[in-house]
Structures are given as C-alpha cells and as structure tokens.
C-alpha cells in the first residue's frame, strides 16, 4: 500500500558534511596556484581515517550519497565542509586561523571549495543547502566571498571560530560589522559549527589532547555570547545566527548567565568600568536569542532533547552529521525513535523540517514529495526503540 506525505515525516538534516578530493579541487583552483598546489599535494599526508577508507567517497559521490540518505530517510541536507581543501593542514572546521603568510594560499583553497560546493549543490538544488566558507583575516575579501556565494546558489555562510590571541579580532569586535551587514542584506544565515578552529594552541604536553577535548565545546560556544553581548543583533535586527553540532544542554544556562550579568550591569550593580556594550543592550540577551538564533542539534540523545523546550521548539533543527562516524547514519530512523518516541507530531515536523526550511530556504513542498517515498513513518517514530543496533557508533545511542 502506498503512503502519503501525511503518513511520513519529511527529514532535513541541519548538519551534513561533504567536500571534494584533491583531484577535484585542482579543477576548481585558480590557475595561478596550480604549481604550488601540485607541490603541496605531493607533500601532504592525510591524517584522517575516514578520508582514507572506503567511506571517503560519501563526501563527493552523488549517487552513493543520495542512495544512502534515501535509505536513511533523509531528503534534505545543510552541507558543511569535510575534506581538506588546498593548502590546509586539516579540514576547515578544525583548522586554526591562517597566519598572514598563510592567508593568500588558504583563501585560494576555500574559494576552490566554494566553487566545487556550488556545483555539488546545483546537482540537487531542492535537497542541498550549501554553506560558503570565508576567512576573517580580511573583512573585505570575506564580504566579497559572501556575495559570490549568494550569487552562485549557496544558502548561507560558515563563520570560522577565532581563538584568543591569534592576531585576528574576536567576534565581538565591530571589525566584522560589514560581514553582518551583507549577510543581513542578502538574508544569508550565519552558521557557526562546533570544532577546533577557535581553540588556542594547547601545547604538546601529556594532557594536551584531554584539555582539547574538554574545552573544544566551550570555545565554539563563545560565539553566542560574543555576538549577543556585543550588540550585533541590536545593530543588525534581521540577522540570523545558527550554532550547529555544539550540543544543547549548555544553552539555557548560558542564556540565564547572560541575562543575570546584563541585569546587574544595567542596574549599576557592577561592570560599568568594563565597558558600555552590555549596559546599552535595550533588552535581555535571551530575547535576542529567541529572535535571531537557531540550534543545529546533531545526533541528540534522549536526554539532549529534554532541553529543546527550554531553548524554543521553533529554534531547534535536528541533524544526522552524515557521513561522520559519530553521526546517526545508517540508523537515523532508529535514533529518532530512541530520542523522540511519544512526542507530538506537529512539534516533530518543526524540529525535523519546518525550522530548517525556514532558515535555509528549502522548498518543503518539493521535499514532501520525496519523503512520501522514503521518509520515516509517523507511526514508526512514535514507537519507542527497544533494541539498539549492535553496530551503531553514534553517541545518540549511548549517551543518557
């Protein structure tokens, strides 16, 4: 018996990753950099297992990717980078900001990726929303890259992290007002992904990696209070900001803390000597969050989703993190059952598709037609998961 849109959920993942391989990126690179690229490519040793094994082609193989996502019940995706673009030491999400000397080559590298991504998304424009990359070393170049991304069919911009004391201004600096202005003008959401790009150098000590793992989330989370408390959303009242794969449990406490600090400052209890920014915010920080911010909740556990109502059910967007090992593929349907069984259908339609469609401009009608064939059944998601797949690798299945 055939099913209809009403029988199934439309699932758009707010967090997926893709990228070209080095041979593909070479085709998209400015010809002026080809000789240097060939020399760099000959020296480069890829440290990432998932970019060496059979799974690596999920990043760029159109047929494989669509087939696997259909089987997993996912019909749309927000596309973040994953592979290593020209002249980078690692993937962009975890790479530190380039030095002044590294900047020209790295800029050529992300522009090659952006060109590749525009073509990748154009192959399935209904199903893919790509995020163009920028670097913050040169604001004028970043603004130009944002305009290029909009003109070439991409759906938003990926905001890098800024580690302390790197020589690049922090995100709370007015330096970046031209970036916020052009994103507001173009109705281009600004998206910040969890990762190591904003983490300072931890040194080479026995506990360095432990400290990195403990603190990487904090350095990503900082972007939220940097933008809110510095008045970015007051100056740019139509700007949209998304935080993806950064967890959810920390957000209510962070908003409470910002509100408390703001309240104390405006009442003159403390902080006047530290600067006027928070004192001049006409409203509590949590109100700016409720109007401007969204959360890409990647592979949320049953406990994580308990925070969604405090965050705002119209602010949360589910993500699979395909094709990462910690993501829910190939058991996204089982993950949804584990985390969301018993939830109200209308609420889940918001979390699974409506919110992300609003932010990134997906055509829900077109995706509903695809989901009518492969989306998870509403009745299936409502049924609690009793047995976790034995080969599941996502923390969604093992976190409380």
Predicted regions mapped to residue ranges:
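Active-site gating loops and adjacent loop-to-helix segments of metal-dependent hydrolytic enzymes
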Residues: 22-56, 92-103, 107, 198-216, ...
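Catalytic pocket-lining loop regions of alpha/beta-barrel enzymes
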Residues: 127, 134, 140, 146-317, ...
């Amino acid at each position: 018996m055939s099913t209809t849109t009403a029988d199934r959920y439309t699932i758009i993942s707010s967090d997926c990753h893709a990228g070209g391989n080095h041979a593909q990126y070479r085709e998209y690179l400015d010809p002026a950099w080809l000789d240097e690229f060939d020399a760099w490519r000959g020296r480069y040793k890829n440290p990432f297992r998932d970019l060496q094994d059979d799974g690596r082609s999920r990043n760029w193989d159109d047929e494989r990717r669509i087939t696997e996502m259909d089987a997993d019940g996912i019909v749309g995706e927000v596309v973040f980078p994953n592979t290593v673009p020209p002249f980078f030491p690692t993937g962009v999400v975890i790479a530190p900001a380039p030095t002044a000397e590294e900047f020209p080559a790295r800029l050529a590298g992300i522009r090659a990726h952006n060109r590749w991504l525009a073509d990748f998304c154009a192959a399935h424009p209904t199903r893919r929303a790509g995020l163009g990359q920028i670097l913050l070393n040169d604001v004028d170049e970043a603004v130009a890259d944002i305009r290029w991304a909009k003109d070439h069919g991409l759906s938003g911009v990926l905001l890098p992290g800024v580690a302390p004391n790197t020589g690049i201004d922090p995100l709370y600096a007015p330096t970046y007002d031209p970036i916020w202005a052009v994103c507001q003008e173009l109705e281009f959401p600004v998206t910040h992904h969890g990762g190591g790009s904003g983490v300072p150098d931890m040194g080479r000590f026995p506990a360095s990696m432990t400290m990195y793992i403990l603190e990487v989330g904090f350095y990503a989370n900082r972007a939220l209070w940097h933008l809110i408390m510095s008045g970015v959303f007051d100056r740019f009242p139509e700007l949209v900001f998304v935080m993806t794969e950064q967890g959810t449990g920390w957000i209510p406490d962070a908003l409470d803390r910002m509100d408390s600090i703001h309240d104390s400052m405006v009442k003159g209890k403390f902080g006047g000597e530290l600067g006027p920014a928070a004192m001049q915010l006409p409203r509590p920080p949590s109100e700016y969050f409720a109007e401007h911010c969204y959360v890409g909740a990647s592979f949320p556990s049953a406990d994580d989703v308990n925070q969604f109502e405090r965050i705002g059910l119209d602010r949360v967007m589910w993500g699979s993190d395909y094709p990462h090992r910690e993501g829910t593929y190939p058991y996204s349907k089982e993950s949804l059952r584990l985390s969301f069984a018993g939830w109200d259908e209308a609420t889940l339609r918001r979390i699974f598709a409506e919110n992300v469609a609003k932010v990134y401009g997906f055509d829900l009608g077109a995706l509903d037609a695809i989901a009518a064939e492969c989306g998870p059944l509403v009745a299936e998601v409502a049924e609690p998961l009793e047995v976790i797949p034995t080969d599941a690798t996502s923390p969604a299945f093992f976190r409380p």
